[in-house]
Amino acid sequence: MNLVELQDVSKNFGALKVTDAVSFAVPKGQALGIIGPNGAGKSTLFNLITGNFAPDAGRVTFLGQDVTRRPAMDRVRMGVGRSFQIPQPFEGLTVYENLAVAASFGRGRSEAAVTQDCIRILEDTELLRLANTQAGALSLLDRKRLELARAMATGPELLLLDEIAGGLTEGECQALIATIKRLHAQGMTIIWIEHVLHALTAVVERLLVLDFGRVIGIGAPDAIMASKEVREIYLGIEA
């Protein structure tokens, strides 16, 4: 079963076509990585999936429902969760309080249910030891973990990760990869935009390559990275 599917989705900003008839589907439980040069349309693609942008053409389906014109908050309630490139937690709140806000926002849940979910997510993201630490005092790695945890606290069926490994040392990156691999092994469906290629290939089953808003390749990571067109466009290597 495809959890999310895009069919010929295009988005223009004035005369600029940012995504051009993009089509792909992600089955439930799969992890898809998205790569491409800066300005290729990757973040716009995320905004089309979350409902922050409406496409000028094409269709977005989630959980078998046409959500093309549904607002972002509806999609959050349906199970679309997202992290952002630059973590922006509530600096004056503790790690636990940041999660509790995300877990309870607009959902009418009991305090006991929120607490249970937050503790589980803190354990899954290795933040339980920092539950009572103010978010403003966290290291970059732990801010990234908190960004991931806040996305998980919304109860997603689909987790969108936007360059979450950026700026980390190799050791920090490996620690974050281990966390994401664990979430994926538990059944989480993931779409992950990333420039740190080895982070992606450690987790995802497929890679999609965007260039000037067009899909130029999608498939197993080894096959994609062996592609002449991908090597020339993305890696700048003549093959």
PLM ranges: what are they?
Residues 2-239:
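Glycine-rich phosphate-binding loops of nucleotide-dependent enzymes
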